[in-house]
Amino acid sequence: MGKQLAKKITWAIENFSSLHSKKIYSDPFIVGGCKWRFLVYPKGNNVDYLFLYLEVADYESLSPEWRRHARYLLNVVNQNSVKRSKQNEEQKWFDVQSPRWGRLSMFPLNEINAKDSGFLVNGELKIVAEIEVLEVIGKLDVSEETSTIMESMDFNGFQLLPSQVDFVRHMFEKHPEIASEFRLKNPNLRAGYMSLLLSLIETLRQSPQELNKVDLAEGYVALRSITDAGFKVDWLEKKLVEISEKKNKEEAGETRMQEINEELESLKQKCLDLEAQLEKEKAEVFAAKSPLSFNDVF
């Protein structure tokens, strides 16, 4: 396969300081037709330093001869100062003996967890990686024709298209509790519910005249499904109710306008009929006032 352009992946780890697991994995993502994931030791790996790896996802199921050559840059983001962010850039061969690379073992955890350090903002640690797949030996996880479509980024545990990340980040900033009660762990289900949420928002961003009753009815069904899954979207429900009320007013107004228009047309026709009748009456009155002719007598 040919060289793949570098792909930027973002992984936001919530409540980093409160994690009790020895190690945690990101959801898998696809770059260059290959599945990858991040591995991090939030409490260190027997030492008080952050360990962060880029790993080939599901490598145990691959054929023994698989190999992947990649250049990657792992960046632990300082959200207050870019200059203080910690980066590790390498170019490595991944294989059955070395399915993961990229430790940041010289990064003290006490520096990450320090108050106002900039690495934890609202308890969230942000990791950004740039990955460039240089060569793949063995079968691709995803064909090159579809890999560009399926490449995704992890944000708050949700797999998103790169084009969706900024919008979703803004949504979480404006509504930080939106997924606080969302408990599903399966990445496909998480992605599905997030897609449903974004589709509902996109629908409600249309003007009321572009929506019909079926759209709104399906919107309520989608909203029920989203809230049942644990999303807190009271603000979205208010918007749906507001749009429904506007749509009802619009339809009621259009119905009344049609009735008034029909009544007006009827009145116009009556006016025309009355004008015609008036002209006829005028003609008869004029004829009645005319002197009689005696030509038929004399």
From Swiss-Prot:
Key words of the record: Coiled coil
Species assigned in the record: Arabidopsis thaliana
MATH domain boundaries: 6-131
Positions in coiled-coil regions: 232-290
A Pfam family this chain is assigned to: MATH_2
UniProt keyword annotation of Translocase present: no
Name the record gives this protein: MATH domain and coiled-coil domain-containing protein At3g58360
